[in-house]
């Protein structure tokens, strides 16, 4: 299980979303290698932030129309936000040594947590990914 809490700042003139604080808590069972677990949380969360804010796959009749990193806006090392990982240990008797999986669970709650933080910041509910500045501005204008 996992839960993410995000605090954002939204520029109402540009639609740009800036993540100010990000906390990611995950129940991992027994934390056999805490440093590795935190790395998985960082990586999964970075992927989720990319999906939430920048990454948009454009398909036309099944063909990828943005097949390069110039047009498909993946986060880079300079874009990754600081994440405060919280490792929760509840021993899972069914798992090896009491551990649970932590493969990509950091990815799953990212977009909803960011969407809720945007709503909390400006009162606009975004329901489509990625939540680009253009989509944020459009939602702000539609709210008025």
PLM feature spans:
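C-terminal catalytic domains of large/alpha subunits in multi-subunit enzymes
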Residues: 1-144
């Amino acid at each position: 299980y996992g839960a993410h809490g995000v605090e954002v700042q939204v520029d109402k003139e540009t639609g740009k979303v800036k993540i100010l604080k990000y906390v990611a808590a995950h129940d991992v069972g027994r934390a056999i290698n805490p440093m590795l677990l935190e790395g998985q949380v960082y990586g999964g969360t970075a992927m989720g932030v990319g999906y939430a804010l920048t990454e948009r796959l454009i398909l036309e009749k099944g063909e990828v129309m943005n097949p390069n990193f110039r047009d498909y806006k993946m986060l880079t090392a300079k874009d990754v936000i600081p994440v405060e990982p919280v490792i929760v240990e509840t021993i899972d008797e069914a798992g090896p040594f009491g551990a649970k999986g932590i493969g990509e669970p950091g990815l799953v709650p990212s977009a909803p947590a960011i969407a809720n933080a945007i709503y909390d910041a400006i009162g606009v509910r975004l329901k489509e990914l990625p939540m680009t500045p253009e989509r944020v501005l459009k939602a702000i204008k539609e709210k008025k």
